[in-house]
Amino acid sequence: MKTTDKIIADYKSRFMAELKTKNPGETEFHQAVSEVVDSVVPYMVQYPYLMEQKVLERMVEPERVIMFRVPWVDDRGEIQINRGYRVQMNSAIGPYKGGIRFHASVNLSIMKFLAFEQTFKNALTTLPMGGAKGGSDFSPRGKSDAEVMRFCQSFMTELQRHIGADTDVPAGDIGVGGREIGYMFGQYKRLRDEFTGTLTGKGQYWGGSLMRPEATGYGACYFAEAMLATRGESFAGKRVCISGAGNVAQYAAQKAMRLGAKVLTLSDSDGFIYDEEGLDEEKMKFVFELKNIRRGRIKEYVTKYPHAKYFAGERPWRIPCDIAMPCATQNEIEKTDAENLVKNGCFCVTEGANMPSTPEAIAIFQGAKILYSPGKASNAGGVATSGLEMTQNSMRLKWTAEEVDQRLRTIMADIHEACIKYGTEEDGYINYVKGANIAGFMKVANAMVEQGLV
């Protein structure tokens, strides 16, 4: 008779071996699935029907994967070809929902990992949304507005046949902001001759929701607030290191400042800035203008504010801080970075990006018993507010910023409570990874079982 531990170990080993055989070379996807498997399999064995129905095996297999060519013409008149993707992972609890990423690193593995993570994140929001992700290996960086528009129109010309307000509702992600959403929505409307909430992140005057740009960064701070409260702490007076300088990082920095923290760093792919005095409203106004209007590099910050320092080719995790908020990209915090953070006094890591910490880094955070939340929980504010935008579109109305912000706060508080429910361990330590994975998994799993083998 096998012991429970033996059953769990054998199942994990067999499951991951089969996954890697079926999905060779997809390291990001393997990593995302492995984290979920570690959390949910010990829970699954308590409910034999989940094993019998092979729910996890079905969950890691996308319902549909769409890959297509995206031809466009650059400003020199030369033809360029990029590759587009849409991974429609799971629709058990609602229409597919997930962002579109334009970045040179985009490949099928990254799209599948993001779509898999999105499924759990969307389930955590309590809103009826399935999981998906899309994108292209096209990078808007260095491209003219006209080139970006031509690419977006070509991309949407193919994608439009696979999406819809009740089928699949894309949004923005890295490389896809309001400009790109606008170009894609315009092309969708032209081709389909309909004005529906098929994309979220739209402009405020044509169906967008107030607070959508702020939502991911603000939501991460609201989640961090709830985490800190479990230890009788708050943002007030805390030193915060933030990576990234895009939408998520900008608004995480703004909200952390307004909650009384001293934000020390921002970064982009070239390096990071360290402002020992801390960012303030005036400095953030400059960052917004630099990144969103001029689309410049973060190193220009030190030209404007010479007291700050710029570190080329580095990440900000060696700067002493109390709270770290990785808001850039996947696997940006590695083992050495995690060791530096813990050694320098960091006691709270709240992820604003998707899977920004490697498994080795997460093990260090949890081993040190510091507060650590995975992106699927703490950065769910963005997709939650996208869901609220879908609701407003379907009702043909518009809520005030205060109404949206209050709903966002409630959703982040509910996600935190779900993490506590499923993630509190015997010694009282809250394992937010375990809590988020089990809470999201059970909602999707039960929906799949109840809907039959489809």
What is the meaning of each model-derived region?
Residues 2-32, 227, 342-454:
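Adenosine-phosphate binding glycine-rich loop
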Residues 111-114, 184, 220-228, 252, ...:
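Buried hydrophobic packing segments
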Residues 167-171, 194-199, 242, 265-268, ...:
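General beta-strand structural signal in soluble alpha/beta enzymes
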Residues 271-372, 377:
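Rossmann-like adenosine-cofactor binding region
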Residues 1-210, 443-452:
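N-terminal ligand-binding/catalytic initiation module
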Residues 147, 179-186, 210, 251-255, ...:
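Short acidic, glycine/serine/threonine-rich loops at helix termini
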Residues 77, 173-174, 209-216, 241-245, ...:
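Active-site nucleophile and cofactor-binding loops and adjacent substrate-binding regions
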Residues 200-203, 208-320:
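Glycine-rich phosphate/diphosphate-binding loop of Rossmann-like nucleotide-binding domains
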